[in-house]
C-alpha cells in the first residue's frame, strides 16, 4: 500500500503496512467477534467501567444478524469470557447460552441494531465520567485532539425517563443517535457504536476519557472559556483519529496487552 491510498493513521506508520484482517468464514468471524467482545468486557472492567450489574456491549452474529451476543446478566465484567456469552434476539429471547439477559440491554441495543444495519457492535455502561458529564446535558466540546474523534459525530439524548426497560425508549435513543458513532444520554451515560467490537469499545473508552478531560479543564478554567480546536483542524484530526480503522487499531493495542496478561477470557 502506498501513502497515496493509505488512511491517515496508516500513513503515520513507516515500515510494515498496517492493514485490517482479511475476510473470514462465518464460524471464524463469529469466534473472532466473541473473543473481541469478551476482551472488551475485561478491558472495561480494568478501566473501572463496571457498576454493579449495569452495562452491556453487544455484537451482531455474522450468520443471524437479527440476533446479537452480549454479557450474561449478573456476571462482573472482569469474569466475562467467550464461553459464557449469550445470544439473544431482538425480543430479548435467549437463543444460545445458559444465563439470564439484562432486559435493559435488549431494550436499548435491539433498537439501535434495528435502526442501524451498518452497526456491528454497541456499547453502554455507567462510567463515572460519562455519567457526570451527561448531567450537563450538552455534547463534548472540541478541546483536544482526542475529542476530535467525535467531531460532528456525536448526539445528545436530552431526556431521562428512568431505567430503560421498554422498546419505545430504546427507539428514541436510536433516533437521537441517528447516523453518528456516539450519543450522550442525559443523566445516564454514554453509548457508542461501530462497525466492529474493536472500534465501538475504543470510542467508548475515548469518549469516557474525553468527558473526564473536559470536566478537569472546566474546573481549572474557573469560569474562563476553554480554547477549542478550530474547525479546519477538527476536520483534519477527525480524518486521523475518528475513522473506523483508527478505532480498530487503537483497541488492538489493549487487546494484545490483555492476551499477554490474562488470556483466560478466550476460554
Name the predicted role of every residue range.
Residues 2-43, 181-267:
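A conserved C-terminal secondary-structure "cap"
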Residues 60, 87-88, 133-134, 193-194:
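Short beta-strand-to-turn element immediately C-terminal to the catalytic PLP-Schiff-base lysine
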Residues 16-91, 249-252:
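N-terminal low-complexity or amphipathic/hydrophobic leaders
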Residues 155-192:
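A contiguous binding-surface segment within folded domains or other stable secondary-structure elements
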Residues 89-130, 167-179:
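Short HxH-centered metal-ligating active-site micro-motif
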Residues 23, 89-100, 151-159:
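Short, basic, glycine/proline-bearing loop/turn elements
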Residues 128-165, 169:
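Class I SAM-dependent methyltransferase SAM-binding "motif I" and its flanking Rossmann-like core
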Residues 66-68, 93, 120-123, 130, ...:
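Structural motif
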